[in-house]
């Protein structure tokens, strides 16, 4: 029985030891435990902040911002208060803490979070004062986590390492302790009136600070960056500014300008109608007038138009004679089109609008307007005209007037066909013979078709152009009859 008791006691002791080890393993590690250096040597700053806020500050720091600072080298951390709504920012020095142990990062973060908590809860707004409230929270967190949060950090070696720009005063203060005239800074900022101690230094010493130390190749790097930064800017500026010695290429304006509301009737420089061509036309018409005497008071008013400007000339109306049939044969009537854009030329030639008698150029009845196209009439041969023209006729002298106001010409009007479009109309005057004028119109309209001969594509016989359609029908019907008769045989 003694053996059984001894065995039971031994088993109980082993069980207790296992339970103790299990309980010790289940206990959470301290925030500054050495094992964290291997488990998580570079923790996430935001994750640590959220964890500590819920664990030690009851979630009161949700409106606080935490971030790294790359330029801050004088202190390990700082808490900045922003506004009255509980907004503040915590910044930790990346240059000082990136090579320090994880323990220093945790303690510095908790230190600044205590300052933020005191500001948010309106207990203490002086971030430099580590008074009773600050010490109370500091000891509370130290007892819970095993950390060693202090009032000031001890990273003096790292701070001195980043102070690579040195200045020394050449006045009496270079012999006074504790600084002996030295000013050491991490940035290249020379001592000046912006420093709070500058006024006192000027009173007690009055010396000037001379730079005695800076990082290696610092001045060369600065000059290189300045050169690289200036060259592209100068190149871009010189690109836009022309050189004074170089001659600038002057490109004249090749477009066409318009003045709104301009009613000038002066001819434009680009007019193609010349007085020489008008004189030749007058000579041609005067010859026909001398051969066939017509009422001398009957005149034709010709208006030469181009780009909205006009030029008027009065010509004696020619009479129709047998010798003039060659000229009239070049005219053949066309049906007028509603779309006036179709009457445009390619070379920008002008148009001539003609009104008969003493009727104004715009007093033309809309019901009596029609268009007649003409072929090229050579002035050298006295049978062709080189200028494009459009004749504006009127059959009813006492009819209603159709005004055509001056409009700004479109760009498409520059391109006009080589052929000229002519409108003409014979007006009855008091001294003219109506029978004679009727025969003249009939002869002029039928002369073109009666004088021209064309070959029939079926029988190859010469036929008048006016009868070609009837002849083709007759030839095709005859061929079809022959084919049917051959098939029936």
From Swiss-Prot:
The modification Phosphoserine is found at residues 268, 373-374, 383. A motif (SHP-box) lies at residues 253-261. The active site is at 112. The keyword ATP-binding does not apply. Changing residue 163 to E: Abolished ability to mediate autocleavage. Strongly reduced DNA-binding. Residues 363-383, 437-451 have a biased composition (Low complexity). The record marks 227-228 as: Cleavage. There is a cross-link at residues 303, 341, 361, 376, 423-424, 484 (Glycyl lysine isopeptide (Lys-Gly) (interchain with G-Cter in SUMO2)). Changing residue 341 to R: Does not abolish monoubiquitination. Autocatalytically cleaved in response to double-stranded DNA-binding: autocatalytic cleavage takes place in trans and leads to inactivation. Monoubiquitinated; monoubiquitination promotes exclusion from chromatin. Deubiquitinated by VCPIP1: deubiquitination is required for subsequent acetylation and recruitment to chromatin and DNA damage sites. Changing residue 189 to E: Abolished ability to mediate autocleavage. Strongly reduced DNA-binding. One of its GO terms (biological process) is positive regulation of protein ubiquitination. Residues 45-212 form the SprT-like domain. DNA-binding activates the protease activity: single-stranded DNA-binding specifically activates ability to cleave covalent DNA-protein cross-links (DPCs). In contrast, double-stranded DNA-binding specifically activates autocatalytic cleavage, and subsequent inactivation. The modification N6-acetyllysine is found at residue 230. Changing residue 230 to R: Abolished acetylation, leading to impaired localization to chromatin. It is an enzyme of class 3 (hydrolase). Disulfide bonds: none annotated. A zinc finger (UBZ4-type) spans 453-480. It is linked to Ruijs-Aalfs syndrome: A syndrome characterized by genomic instability, progeroid features, and susceptibility toward early onset hepatocellular carcinoma. This is DNA-dependent metalloprotease SPRTN. It comes from Homo sapiens. The lineage of its organism: Eukaryota, Metazoa, Chordata, Craniata, Vertebrata.
């Amino acid at each position: 029985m003694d053996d059984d008791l001894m065995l039971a006691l031994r088993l109980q002791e082993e069980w207790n030891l296992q339970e103790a080890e299990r309980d010790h393993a289940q206990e959470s590690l301290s925030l500054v435990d050495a094992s964290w250096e291997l488990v998580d040597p570079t923790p996430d700053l935001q994750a640590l902040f959220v964890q500590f806020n819920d664990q030690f500050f009851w979630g009161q720091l949700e409106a606080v911002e935490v971030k790294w600072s790359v330029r801050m080298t004088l202190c390990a951390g700082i808490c900045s208060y922003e506004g009255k709504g509980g907004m503040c920012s915590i910044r930790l020095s990346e240059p000082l803490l990136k090579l320090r142990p994880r323990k220093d990062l945790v303690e510095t973060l908790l230190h600044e979070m205590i300052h933020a908590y005191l500001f948010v809860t309106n207990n203490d707004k002086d971030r430099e004062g580590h008074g009773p409230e600050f010490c109370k929270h500091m000891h509370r967190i130290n007892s819970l986590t095993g950390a060693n949060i202090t009032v000031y950090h001890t990273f003096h070696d790292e701070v001195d390492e980043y102070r690579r720009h040195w200045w020394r005063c050449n006045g009496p203060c270079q012999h006074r302790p504790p600084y002996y005239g030295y000013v050491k800074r991490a940035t290249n900022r020379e001592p000046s009136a912006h420093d709070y101690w500058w006024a006192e230094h000027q009173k007690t010493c009055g010396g000037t600070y001379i730079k005695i130390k800076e990082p290696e190749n610092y001045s060369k790097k600065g000059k290189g960056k300045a050169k690289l930064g200036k060259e592209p800017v100068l190149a871009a500026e010189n690109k836009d500014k022309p050189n004074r010695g170089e001659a600038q290429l002057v490109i004249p304006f090749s477009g066409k300008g318009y003045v709104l509301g301009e009613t000038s009737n002066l001819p434009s420089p680009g007019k193609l109608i010349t007085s020489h061509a008008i004189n030749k036309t007058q000579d041609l018409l005067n010859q026909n007038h001398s051969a066939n005497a017509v009422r001398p008071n009957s005149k034709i008013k010709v208006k030469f138009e181009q780009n909205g400007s006009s030029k008027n000339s009065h010509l004696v109306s020619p009479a129709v004679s047998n010798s003039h049939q060659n000229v009239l044969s070049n005219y053949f009537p066309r049906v007028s089109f509603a779309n006036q854009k179709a009457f445009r030329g390619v070379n920008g030639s002008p148009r001539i609008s003609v009104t008969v008698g003493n009727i104004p150029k715009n007093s033309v009845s809309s019901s009596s307007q029609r268009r007649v196209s003409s072929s090229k009439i050579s002035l050298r041969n006295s049978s062709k005209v080189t200028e494009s023209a459009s004749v504006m006729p009127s059959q009813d002298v006492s009819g209603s007037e159709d005004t055509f106001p001056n409009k700004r010409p479109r760009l498409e009007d520059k391109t006009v066909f080589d052929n000229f479009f002519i409108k003409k109309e014979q007006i009855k005057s008091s001294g003219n013979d109506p029978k004679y004028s009727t025969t003249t119109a009939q002869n002029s309209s039928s002369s073109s078709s009666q004088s021209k001969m064309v070959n029939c594509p079926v029988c190859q016989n010469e036929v008048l152009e006016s009868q070609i359609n009837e002849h083709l029908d007759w030839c095709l019907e005859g061929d079809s009859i022959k084919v049917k008769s051959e098939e029936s045989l």
